[in-house]
């Protein structure tokens, strides 16, 4: 209609960044092959050990995928006891991306995992990078880290149940290592985009880390049921100006 698009989706669609055939979504059907190593002493609340995994997801068209792709994902987690099982330093490192052609745009946010569990929708939020807005970080090749200091400061019994209270402080971050080059396509459009920030639309720009920090309290019952309350705050207001409160179960990793 000649008017400037009023949403990013409309802008990317009109510029051809999102192809017309992908604009209404599609199907993703994949086969995953990988390896996992797990030496944690307790699955729910580990105090020592390593939990590492690597996998490749194949999603060819002949098994029903609308736009074929191949994705890899590598995750390393380590639990380091500092003082017995009372004070533990834990960290998680992740790097993932696509081999060959880029996938459809609607596949980019998903963080695929190996083993039991479910795929996560984008980086940002309780299951990936606390303090950041959900889906804040997306790209062809991406990575994130979580670091956490866990302190079990008191134990007691209630109704014959073992109860532990624990505090934690965390520092998380994520970054795009390879983005999608959209700058040239957008600049070809004469849409009056004088205020559009093209710095965020080039794969040649080195993205910075999107960082956040915070802390939380956990109630651990019988070493296997955990109630968690955490608050995270992003360092940059563009990543999340308000901070985020999480009430959930278990540890992040």
Q: Where in this protein do the model-derived segments appear?
A:
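Subset of outer-membrane beta-barrel
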Residues: 1, 217-220, 226-228, 232-234, ...
């Amino acid at each position: 209609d000649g008017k400037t698009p009023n949403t990013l989706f409309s802008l990317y669609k009109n510029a051809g960044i999102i192809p017309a055939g992908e604009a209404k979504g599609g199907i993703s059907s994949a086969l995953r092959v990988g390896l996992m190593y797990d030496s944690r002493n307790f699955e729910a609340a580990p105090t020592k050990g390593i939990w590492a995994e690597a996998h490749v997801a194949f999603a060819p068209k002949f098994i029903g995928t609308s736009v074929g792709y191949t994705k890899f994902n590598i995750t390393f987690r380590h639990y380091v006891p500092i003082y017995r099982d009372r004070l533990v330093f834990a960290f998680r490192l992740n790097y993932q991306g696509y081999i060959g052609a880029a996938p459809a745009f609607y596949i980019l946010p998903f963080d695929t995992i190996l083993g039991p569990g479910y795929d996560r929708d984008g980086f940002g939020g309780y299951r990936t990078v606390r303090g950041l807005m959900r889906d804040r970080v997306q790209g062809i090749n991406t990575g994130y880290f979580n670091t956490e200091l866990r302190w079990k400061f008191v134990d007691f019994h209630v109704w014959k149940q073992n109860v532990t209270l624990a505090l934690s402080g965390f520092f998380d971050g994520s970054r795009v290592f390879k983005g999608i080059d959209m700058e040239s396509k957008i600049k070809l459009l004469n849409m009056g985009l004088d205020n559009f920030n093209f710095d965020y639309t080039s794969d040649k720009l080195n993205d910075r880390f999107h960082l956040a920090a915070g802390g939380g309290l956990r109630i651990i019952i019988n070493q296997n049921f955990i109630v968690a309350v955490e608050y995270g705050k992003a360092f940059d207001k563009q990543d999340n100006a308000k901070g985020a409160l999480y009430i959930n179960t278990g540890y992040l990793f």
